[in-house]
Amino acid sequence: MRKEVGPLKRYAPLIAACLLAGLVAFPFLRNVVTGERGMPGAQIGGHFTLQTSAGPLDTASLGTELIMIYFGYTYCPDVCPTELARMAQVYQGLGSDKTRVSGLFVTVDPERDTVAAVTEYARAFEPTFKGLSGDRVRIEQVMRRYQVYAQKAGEDPSNYTVDHSSRIYLMNSDAKLMALFSMDTDIPTMIDQVKTFL
C-alpha cells in the first residue's frame, strides 16, 4: 500500500530552495517595485475570526501594530511556498521590530487544509506565523472582505489545484489596508514599506 505523503513533506525541498534563493539574492535585490499602497477608505480588509491550533483567533486580539496576511493552500505546488518564504524574509528583515508585526497564513482550501495542516505549514516558514482555517462559509466571507480570488481546477475531489490571487496584505491594527505586495515587489522594498508604518 502506498503511503500518502503530506503537503509539507512533499514540498519541503521546494520550501528550502525558496528560502535559500531569497537569502542569496537579498543583497542584490535593488530593483525598486513599489508595493500597491492602500487608499483611505479602500474596501479591502476588516477583522475576522478563524480557527488556529490554539482555538478561535480574532485578528483584533493580536496586539501587534501591523499584520501581514497571505491567502493560499498547503497543497500549492509553487506560488504559496515562494510567497510565504518571502513573507518570512520580510519578517526577519525587520530585526527587533518584528515583534510588532504578526504573520498569518489563511487557507483558501478548507476542505483539505485542517487547522493542524495550516499550522504546521505556516510554522515551517516562520515559527511565529499562525495558520488559519475554518468552514467554507467563513473562509469565503474573509476572502470577499479581502477581495481574494480562488477557484478549484480539476475534477478529482481529492487531487486538484486551486487557482488563486497572490498578494501579501499589510494591515494595521484596525485591519485597514496599508499596502499590497505583489510577487514582483522585491524584499528590501517590502521591508522599507513595513517600517514606514511602524
Predicted regions and their residues:
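A short beta-strand-turn-helix
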Residues: F48-I67, Y91-L94
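Short, hydrophobic alpha-helical segments
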Residues: F197-L198
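N-terminal targeting signals for export/organelle localization
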Residues: M1-T49
